[in-house]
Swiss-Prot record:
Enzyme Commission number: 7.1.1.-
The family this protein is said to belong to: Belongs to the complex I subunit 4L family.
Biological role: NDH-1 shuttles electrons from NADH, via FMN and iron-sulfur (Fe-S) centers, to quinones in the respiratory chain. The immediate electron acceptor for the enzyme in this species is believed to be ubiquinone. Couples the redox reaction to proton translocation (for every two electrons transferred, four hydrogen ions are translocated across the cytoplasmic membrane), and thus conserves the redox energy in a proton gradient.
GO BP annotation list: ATP synthesis coupled electron transport
UniProt superkingdom: Bacteria
GO cellular component assignments: NADH dehydrogenase complex; plasma membrane
Subunit and partners: NDH-1 is composed of 13 different subunits. Subunits NuoA, H, J, K, L, M, N constitute the membrane sector of the complex.
Keyword list, A-Z: Cell inner membrane, Cell membrane, Membrane, NAD, Quinone, Translocase, Transmembrane, Transmembrane helix, Transport, Ubiquinone
Enzymatic reactions: a quinone + NADH + 5 H(+)(in) = a quinol + NAD(+) + 4 H(+)(out)
UniProt-recorded name of the protein: NADH-quinone oxidoreductase subunit K
Gene name tied to this protein: nuoK
Broad EC category: translocase
Keyword Transport belongs to the record: yes
Amino acid sequence: MNAIPLEHGLALASVLFALGLVGLMVRRNILFVLMSLEVMMNAAALAFVVAGSRWGQPDGQVMFILVLSLAAAEASIGLAILLQLYRRFHTLDIDAASEMRG
């Protein structure tokens, strides 16, 4: 069975990371910002898996598990902030979060 070349896997991870970064910069809705962060984290995890597969080391898979647990924690905290923002201001606009300080 032929493996996917390292360049193809890293190119896909780079494209996914760039798409997540664009979504992070362009969108003002906090839900889309969280989704863009998830795409970026999954792109980094994909790069770890591809690199670990290339050199036959399980380190990439271990890093993937760590990134996956970090993404789960980030999603739960982000969704909790999203719920509080919506309950207080009835909007999901990320600029409304600056008004939460008072």
